[in-house]
Structures are given as C-alpha cells and as structure tokens.
C-alpha cells in the first residue's frame, strides 16, 4: 500500500473510502478529517498486506483529494500538503514537509523532521516522533506516546496531551497547551504563551518574554523566568522556579514551592494562592496579599511584602526586609543579623524571633509574642507590641510607641521620647526609662529599672531587683518587697510602699508619701523625703539627708551624722537622734524619742510618749505631757511640763529653764535643774540631785 491515495465520498455507501490515484471522487469534498474518523482510517491502513518494497517520494503535492501513507522504510522528501493528508507509521519517515492546509499524521514509530506548518495540523501519537518542526500558523497535536523535539512555534499552536511529550520547544509568537497527562520539557518562551492544565506538566521551561499559565491540576517544574510572566492558579503548581527578571503570580488556589527570586524578579501571591520554601535573593521581591500565603521563605537580601489579608509563616530573614502592612500578617519569622522586619499600618507579626536583626513596629503596626535573642525591636509612632521576651537583645520604645507585657530575662528595654510600656517583667535584665518615656506596672524580680531625664514610672513592684531614679526621673506607687529603690541626682518618687526591701534617697533625690511596712528607708547626702509612714520598718536619715512629716506608727526613725528631720509624728514606734542628727517639731503620741551622742531636737511635743536625752544629746523647747528622761550627760532647755507630764533628771543629766505647768520635775542622783519655773505642779529633788 506504499503509494499515493485519494479519499473520495461514496454516494451509495454514504461514507469516505480510500481509492487509488486513478479513481475520481464524486460528491462532497472535505477540508480536514475529523480526529474521531481518523482513528478508523488509520486502522484500515494498518491491515495486513502483501509486503512491498520501500518507496521514496520527492516533491509531492497533496491537495484536498489526495493522501500519502508511509511505512516500513518509506520516505518522503519536500512534500507539500495543500489540503490532503500524509500518514507516517511503522518506520516510515517524512522529511522537509510543508503543511499549508490538511494534515500530517505520525504514529506507530513513524517519524517526521524539518516540518513547516503554515496551516492545517500535524498529529503525533502512538510512538510517532517529530523533530525540527516550525509552526507558523497551524496546529501540532502530540498524544498517546508521541513526541516532538526542537519545535519552533511562531504563530501557531502546539497541543500536548494524554502521554504526549514535547522537548526543547521554542515559542516565538504562538501557543503551547499541555494537558491531560501531556508533558513539555525544556520549552523556551520568547514571546508566546504556554498553558499547562488538567494533569499536564512542564519541566525546565525558560520564559524570556512570554507567558506561562499553570492551572487546574497542571504543574511546572524548574522553570526559569528571565523577563516574562508565570501564572499559577486554580489548582496549578510550580516547583523550583527561578525568577531572574520576570514575574511569577500565584493566585486562586495555585501553589508554588522552592521558588528562587533573584535580582529584579517578582513573585505575587494572592487570592488563596500559596508559596512554600521561597528564596528571595538581593534585588528580588515577594508580594503577598488578598488571602495569599507564603511558608518557609528565606530572605537573603530581597524584600517580602505582606498586606491586605496576605500571610506568611516561618520566614527566615538573613538579610533584606520583610514588610507587613494594611492587614497583612506573619507568624514565626526569624530575623538574623542584617535582616529587618517592618510592621506598620495595621500589619501584624506573631511569634517573631530576633536573633541579631531588627524588628521595626510603627504607625499602627503590632507585634505579638516576639523573642529577642540578640538584636533590636524598635516601637515608635503608634506601633504597639505585646508579650515580647528579651533574652539578650534590646527593645526600644519611643515617639508614641507602646509595649505591653514584656519579659526582660537578659538584655535591655529602653523607653524614651513619649514611648510607653506596661506590665513589664524584669527577671535579669534592665529597663531604662528616660526623656519622656513612661512605664506602668513593671515587676522587677531580678535586674534593674532605671528612670532618668524626664522618664516616669508608676506601679512598679520590686521583688528582688533594683529601681534607680535620677536626673529628673520619677516613680509613683512603687512597691519594694525585696530589693532596692535608689533615688538620687534630682530623681523623685511618691507613694512608695516598702514591705521588705530598701529605699535609698541621696544626692538631691526626693521621696514623697513613702510607706515603710517592713524594710528600710535611707536618706543621705542631700536626699530628702516627706510624708513617710513607718508602720513596721526603719527610716535612716544621715549625712545631710532630711525627712519632713514622717509618721512612725511602729518601727524606727534613726537620725544621725548630719541628718535632719522635722514634723515627725511618733504614734507607736521610736525616733533615734544621734551623732549630729537633728529633729524639729516631733510629736510623740505613743512611743519613744531617744537623743544621744550629739543628737539634738527642738520643739518636741510629748503627748503620751517618752523622750530620752543622754550622752551628749540635747533637747530644746520640748512640750511635755508624757515622760522626759535626761541622763548621762544629756541636756534639755526650756521644757514645758503640763499636767500629766513628768521630767526626770538623773545621772549627770541637766535641765535648764524648765517650766512646770501642772506636771512634775524629778531631780535625782547627780541630775541637776537650773532656772526652773514652777507655775503649777511639783518639783521633787532626791538625794544627790541639785537645783538652782
């Protein structure tokens, strides 16, 4: 059967039949055989025949009424198909065929090379193969084990399906469709279109300036985008894409994994699209929005931007930027040295780990549960963070930024220039509040809170660490359970509760309305306090320190070494004045004032309590309605003793100018009283006592 055939319409049988070239057709002429009819025709041509010698055809023209069949060593050169059909199978070959209209069918081991398709189509199936095809206006179909190599599409279409395979296709200005189990390998798209869907696959495609569309179950592997566009959507997937200078868009259920974005490359992820294990190198860009998501992205100098409902998780920033804004969100980002995460305008970052890089939160952005191992978290201009753990780096809050529930294990929280924080726990590091910064409800378990230069704090709990207030810093309502509050150099505090620790006021520091339940308040070197309530602990005033309006309910006020106090009320505790200390206008309702070793008091009112003056201590202008004891070198001047009061002078004690107005003065055993005035009451002088 190796010859030229005609296909004609048989009027009587109502079907197409194959005849020899001498048979003339009658009836209707066809333009192109339908592929459903083609299968039966091919089967007919494959019926067993008597073996024939291989034939060679040159320069044949197949018009609408003719066809050619090549098999078993047959070959045709320079055939032109102008409406007819050429069948190549079983070892037949067609070389340098031109298809203007009609069809070339290659199957069952047939081959074709250097075909030009201007119109019509070429069909390769069932083990057929073609090489070096140029499609400039027609179609090429590859299926069922057929293959095409080195095809150039410059205006036509290549269809690959059902096990067909196209290798090294170049699309200059046309269309390649891969579907239903078809595959394309090493395609180069310069200006055309590649469409992969429904189980089709493309491997090692290079997109220079054209378009690759992967959807509906199609897949693309190892694509390189130099300047064109790759779209993955509707169940399509792309693996190991390299974007050099073009665009990959992943949307509407598309999936991309292992993408590498190099300089000038862009990846867009939106509308339910997802990307996994993307690498963004220097100059690359990944943009995620509108329900798109990215997982396990590595940023090595490029930019990842998440906004408008986009999300990213498990990103690693080695260098470069991650930007979250306008409703975008990220989780579990790790930032290394040289990397930066920027969150603003309603962006949200959760679970970020800063390990040498920086997280910047501003302008309505927020970060939750950040861990700072080393590096910097900066919050400013309306940014806010919560649940940050600082275990080695720095959190900087300024210019309207806010931080809530930060834990400082090791490292530094700095608050300044209008920044504010609340609920910070310091368990080993430092909190520094300055220049208009503020902190509320800080807990210092171990470590340091420093407040200076206009910084202010309130509600701090010190349960083991230290609070240092200086240089215009202020603290309100601090509780010192265990640890130290230090106030100096112009620092000031108010409402401090000391229930086990210590408050140290010096060098121009001041404290107002401190309550000492248990522990110590120390005031020295120019420090000053007022309104202190001692209800169980101790207040120690020395070396130029001063205290005003202290109330001692239970506990001790000690004044020595140049310390001075005024307006103290003792209603159950003790005031101890010695070694150059002084007290003015003390009122003793219940309790004891002891003055010795060079201590001095003035204007004390004893209204039920006791005053003991000894060993070089002195008291002036005391009002006595209780008990005053002067002994062992102590001296008093101008004590007024009212009814119910008693002044006892003994053992080298001296009282001068006492006025007895209803009470009693008792002088005994080496005591002496000079210039006493008895207006009413009793002066009793015992053996060894002297009055004059």
Task: Give the residues covered by each predicted segment.
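Short acidic, Pro/Gly- and aromatic-enriched capping/linker segments at domain boundaries
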Residues: 1-6
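Thr-biased low-complexity repeat/linker tracts and other Thr-enriched repetitive architectures
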Residues: 85, 89-100, 105-266, 270-303, ...
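Gram-negative bacterial Sec-dependent N-terminal signal peptides
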Residues: 8-53
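Short N-terminal segments immediately surrounding and downstream of signal-peptide cleavage
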Residues: 56-72
